[in-house]
Amino acid sequence: MKEYTLEEFQNELRLGIPDPLPEPQPYDPTVNHAPKRKDILTPAEKKLAIRNALRYFPAKYHKMLAKEFANELKEYGRIYMYRLRPTYKMYARPIDEYPARCRQAAAIMLMIQNNLDPAVAQHPHELITYGGNGAVFQNWAQYRLVMKYLSEMTDEQTLVMYSGHPMGLYPSHKDAPRVVVTNGMMIPNYSKPDDWERYNALGVTQYGQMTAGSYMYIGPQGIVHGTTITVLNAARKLGGGTAGKLFITAGLGGMSGAQPKAGDIAGVVSITAEINPAATQKRYEQGWVDEVHADLDELFAAVNKSIAAKEAKSYAYQGNVVDLWEYCADKGIKVDLGSDQTSLHNPWAGGYYPVGVSFEDAKVMMAEKPELFKEKVQESLRRHVAAVNKLTARGMYFFDYGNAFLLESSRAGADIWNADHTAFRYPSYVQDIMGPMCFDYGFGPFRWVCTSGKPEDLDKSDHIAMEVLGEIAATAPAEIQQQMHDNIQWIRGAKENHLVVGSQARILYADCEGRTKIAARFNEAIKKGEISAPIVLGRDHHDVSGTDSPFRETSNIYDGSNRCADMAVQNVIGDSFRGATWVSIHNGGGVGWGEVMNGGFGMVLDGSEACDRRLRMMLHWDVNNGISRRSWARNEGAMFAIKRAMDICPELKVTMPNLVDDEVLEGLF
């Protein structure tokens, strides 16, 4: 890879799509690539896909590029425009290295490049950050145009993004978002998995997952705090602490890769199965898993020693998760906790691999024999569930981690329903843990990125956050003392847990009061020069208000509205005019295309008084919107939390539900 001077790098960003075009680049086999996508387009649609791709280029290049893009479509199922992939190193540079007329635009450039950093992204050359299909852009022409627009943007313009495509810069004003992102917005009738395959191949939409297409991914750290909370509280359900408990799960990808680290922090022994050797090796080299084994007998010889010693240790099983579960069921192994975080939101395109088929053979099968691949996946899910059922009958606590495991298992005909076939036999982790303990009280995955790139700025921010949480905990009500204690323990140990992959970022579960006070202290520290550069605030879309998803984020909503998407849409609209630097709204994310509506924001803190005003207004809405909806659904914790919020802020007036006695309804129908 060519070494660029700072001036050369900045000129490349300003350039946009080069003319003349760069030479084609060879396919790099050392990088983890996306699997070949399904060949779903008709011949006429393939011509349309080429026509759509060529509109980024002058006519003089059309004949040459038409053949090149046709070959990409044939070989990979998508047009990535590999020729335009930059040859400079892709990572989050210090904010001052980005050529921008507007500080906010420079911060967004940093966040985009972090999402595409090979150390961070799952399939960096295909612009996929995580989840198998969570895209930042559809192709490299879009990336180059976005960087050009951001380098030109003033603080009175807004960049409009249509599913990776930059529609353009439009006049706005200083308090407007600098970027507004939509990903995968479809007419509801056209939101099935094959619709994603077709319209993504045509180059007209994309699946942004959550933080991939919204430029807010911070590596596997992004969910490790939530996963730690989940594992801790799942273990608490069994009693007796976490030491010596065995947790088995699957997935070492961009999000799922947080599981072994979370297990270590929670104090359990964990085994995480992963079929992709490149993903396993990546997490091992990054220190996110302690040992890797491909032989099950050898694996459990080591695991049993860790259990006996009651040491926190993480193991990766390099192989198929079904083989792992069936081994445990057949050998009578005691498993305390079980889950799954394979990408079952994307089951037919690399999110889940069938047992009995090698990884490489499965990739060929999914592209060339998609119906057979689907049959094999569903057969594997039936075996997967059967083994899990045997272990839960012996006392294991199993929970769905919001990856569509229960949903796809039910579609596969697995024995996943309860006795009267009215609900799944296993809870979503949101139903049992995250919803009632965190979301209903306003706690969720708040995050920040120090744009200086300096670890010392991150250290300072950790210290500020710990101080603020300590102050809040001193007078917090009993209902949230456990959450406050867990979060203080988290931030106290954050540095020593070596969580940073990519940008200097931190994840921290916090409620409205915590987020607002931490952000205000950050802004003050930037103003005083105690933190040397702006901080980007954000959160996962998987949060109190950000996502409507009946199989995950809103699975503990029982008033019938768990399939309604008003909350997520209202949230992004409200954030946009209350001061967010950028906002996004996506179809899909977590459980899958057509199953979820989710959104997020980014906010650049620059030390100004205007920023202090915006952060207080926006964060208050961003949390209390979701608490209000959860309260209206009669969730006890949310009713408590929103009443408390109204006491703190007299301007907040929320409609409260009147509870109905069961006797009133008896005998009516």
PLM feature spans:
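Residue-level detector of anion-binding/catalytic polar loops
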Residues: 269, 334, 397
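Active-site/ligand-binding-proximal alpha/beta "capping" segment
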Residues: 314-342, 349
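Small-residue-enriched alpha-helical segments and adjacent helix-cap loops
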Residues: 535, 539-570
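Long, compositionally biased, glycine/small-hydrophobic-enriched stretches that function as flexible linkers
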Residues: 1-201, 205-216, 370-521, 525-538, ...
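Short catalytic-loop micro-motif centered on adjacent basic/acidic residues
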Residues: 246-249, 312-317, 399
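Glycine-rich beta-alpha junction loops
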Residues: 277, 319-322, 341-346, 402-408, ...
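Catalytic or ion-translocation cores adjacent to nucleophile or general acid/base/metal-coordination motifs
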Residues: 208-232, 236, 242-246, 250-310, ...
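Solvent-exposed alpha-helices and their adjacent loops that cap or buttress functional pockets
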Residues: 152-154, 170-174, 189-190, 238-242, ...
